[in-house]
Amino acid sequence: MKRREAREKALQALFQIELNEMSLDQAIKNIMEDEQDDYMEKLVEGVMANKAEIDAIIEPNLDNWRMDRLSKVDLSLLRLSVYEIKYLDDVPNRVSLNESIEIAKIYSDEKSSKFINGVLANIAPEDK
């Protein structure tokens, strides 16, 4: 599975966890069915293990927004992206930013992709 697809599947699992208060294992199983992808699982597990710290990074960068007002898709995507940016050294920040924007265009809308870009641009230094 390519990393883009793994990110999309991770977003779907995180969305299910957020929306339905589903367990991590059940969400991964629902999304992956009989497939397995280590990177996808690493993303979901990493976000959930570091959720409080990730939210503490996101919140001050929301500019007149509150976490509870964000759509579940946008919140899940921001968490996923911040995890990649702050916790994974093998993914350049610009790649994570671009992937997040493109995924937002698919699962959210143009306005959300611009919002996500703005939030992540404040969080991620370009040079990593």
From Swiss-Prot:
Pfam families: NusB. GO terms for biological process: DNA-templated transcription termination; transcription antitermination. GO terms for molecular function: RNA binding. It comes from the Bacteria. InterPro entries: NusB-like_sf (IPR035926), NusB_fam (IPR011605), NusB_RsmB_TIM44 (IPR006027). GO terms for cellular component: cytosol. Keywords: RNA-binding, Transcription, Transcription antitermination, Transcription regulation. Belongs to the NusB family. Involved in transcription antitermination. Required for transcription of ribosomal RNA (rRNA) genes. Binds specifically to the boxA antiterminator sequence of the ribosomal RNA (rrn) operons. This is Transcription antitermination protein NusB. It comes from Listeria monocytogenes serovar 1/2a (strain ATCC BAA-679 / EGD-e). The gene is nusB.
